[in-house]
Amino acid sequence: MLRKGICRLIHQVSESSKKPYFLTTPIFYVNAAPHLGHLYSLVLTDAIARFQNLKPDVSVISSTGTDEHGLKVQTVAQTEGVSPLQLCDRNSKRFADLAVAANTKFTHFIRTTNPKHQASVQEFWKTIQKAGMISFERHEGWYCVSDETFYPESAIQKVVDPATKQEKRVSMETGKEVQWSSEMNYHFLLSKFQSRLIEHYNKNPNFVQPSIFHTQVLEELKTGISDLSISRPKQRLSWGIPVPGNSQQTIYVWLDALINYISVIGYPWLNEKSSLSAGWPANMHVIGKDIIRFHCIYWPAFLMAAGLPLPEKILVHSHWTMNKVKMSKSLGNVVDPFWLIEKYGVDTIRYYLLKRGRLTSDSNFDIEELEKDEEHDLRRSLGVLLSRLQSKKLFISNEIQKQWHKKDDFTEYEDIVHELIELPVVCAQSIDGGCVYEVINLVQSVLRRVTKLFQLKEPWKLSDDSQEKIDTLMLVAHSLRISGILLQPIMPTKSTELLDQLGIPKNQRSLQNATNVFEPTEFTFHSGNNSHLFDKRTQ
């Protein structure tokens, strides 16, 4: 019987462990205001963290924050006539406010201007210097101010500036202009880690996901990597953390920034046991595709040099565009994330971004598409189904519900029941790969099928003691219950409202509860509190 199939369901839950599940967003650069891409990184990471929280005996640590040093911050502050710290204080608050507005539940918010972080960075420097992985020598190369990095000759190209008609050199990766620079810097001996990095990538095929990015990094490693400049002369860059033992040099902003992932949980640790209890190694870093090299080559090499374990997984996502063009203030196609949340509501925006956002390809922001998703997926599919279930004509007593839960023959509804059985497991697999959009598509598939069943059976026309009516309503109720549980990481507020209206106790909303398709539940039918889950939008 299908009941046996339910019992054999593999629960994808983590065993109780002393090590918390730790995942991170990139920390955001404070030279400009938050944009849609920042919001997507926040809600994607938060949704994955919330899904982990649905598992029993799992402690979750999640961090976000702001990257506040470097030449760009120093330059913008000078332009605005404020101190770098004043600029950082103002803009860091905007990112913290966005995290709150997006209803994210990060346990840590880090700022790289925090003295504890700066102490961690200097300790890390001393560790890799003691390991013999830092040299001091003249560095010459093509430097990009906006990217704050040196590029090798092979990574630049000549182009003609359309405005000036003059030839210039730009980064092939970012398109930003580069200039020749020659100065004394500290260097990290990155080239010494080429073979170790390649070996790690070969042994851990899921280290960078999706696989297209794993392959991309591996190919870059095979072509060879050069030693990396990790400091700048103080006379050129004063806004940053001084190199230990040489106050005339400032630590490279990317080395500083990457260390946030360990400083936020207390690095340096006393021993391996204390690092594990703090959360390291991280289970997942979530990053945008524009910072792959820093996270997938530099960061693992830095950790190897310091004798620290590497993160379990680096999840890469693509960008958001408008009209298929990268968002830019000069083009007037920038969307204010605060305005979006204010106008459409946080759960609708979270749902839209997580449904439409992709990992391997850029996603195009479209207001009409957003409103279509809100109308069809949320109001008509989820909202209307809940509203219909709570009609006065469709009441089922608790006694009848208790008798129904003893039933073990669902042959007539076999396809839907099988889909419900598989739903939590497949959703867990999708979350593990960072594909939150697949969770939404899977849930919507179930809701569409159940809606068709509801329309086909027309339970409002059947007598109260009709077994067909009871079966239909209980199947719809459990489908909404399971959908509500699985949508909690995506739409925390609306999912809570849905489960509240169904009468699901707070302690019965875990992944384990979702895996039991017909878990004995006393649903609230026609409670009198069945307000519309999604009100009709007024223009």
Curated annotation (Swiss-Prot):
Q: Which InterPro entries match?
A: Met-tRNA_synth, Met-tRNA_synth_2, Methionyl/Leucyl_tRNA_Synth, MetRS_core, Rossmann-like_a/b/a_fold, tRNAsynth_Ia_anticodon-bd
Q: Which organism is it from?
A: Schizosaccharomyces pombe (strain 972 / ATCC 24843) (Fission yeast)
The record's family statement is: Belongs to the class-I aminoacyl-tRNA synthetase family.
Broadest EC class assigned to this enzyme: ligase
One Pfam entry for this protein is tRNA-synt_1g
Cellular localization per UniProt: Mitochondrion matrix
Q: What is its main location?
A: mitochondrion
Give start-end ranges for motif 'KMSKS' region.
326-330
* Alphabetically ordered keywords of this record: Aminoacyl-tRNA synthetase, ATP-binding, Ligase, Mitochondrion, Nucleotide-binding, Protein biosynthesis, Transit peptide
Protein's name in the database: Probable methionine--tRNA ligase, mitochondrial
Q: Where does ATP bind?
A: K329
